[in-house]
């Protein structure tokens, strides 16, 4: 399943950004964002992935608790565990960030 939708969220980082590099030395940063939705008792959590120069800037300007705007596409990802069980998760592939 690879469902895609474009979204814009505002929230706060749940932990410090994690910067890594692909085999081709392309920077990729991952972090989670907690978005408070009016009428909901607990925040909605988003897994965010950022690529390229923006990924490197995330580790400079962001830390746990930082407010941020994120715009991008949601992707439903699927993987198989070591036990053979199929699992899914949603990931926001960010193309526009607003450091606040």
What are these regions (language model features)?
Residues 1-100:
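Single-stranded nucleic acid-binding surfaces, predominantly the OB-fold ssDNA-binding core
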């Amino acid at each position: 399943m690879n469902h895609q939708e474009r979204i814009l969220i505002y929230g706060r980082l749940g932990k410090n950004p994690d910067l890594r590099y692909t085999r081709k030395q392309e920077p990729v940063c991952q972090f989670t964002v907690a978005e408070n939705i009016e009428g909901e008792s607990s925040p909605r959590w988003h897994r965010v992935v950022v690529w390229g120069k923006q990924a490197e800037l995330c580790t400079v300007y962001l830390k746990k608790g930082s407010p941020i705007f994120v715009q991008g596409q949601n992707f439903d990802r699927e993987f198989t565990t070591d036990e053979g069980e199929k699992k899914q998760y949603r990931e926001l592939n960010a193309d526009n960030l607003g450091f606040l």
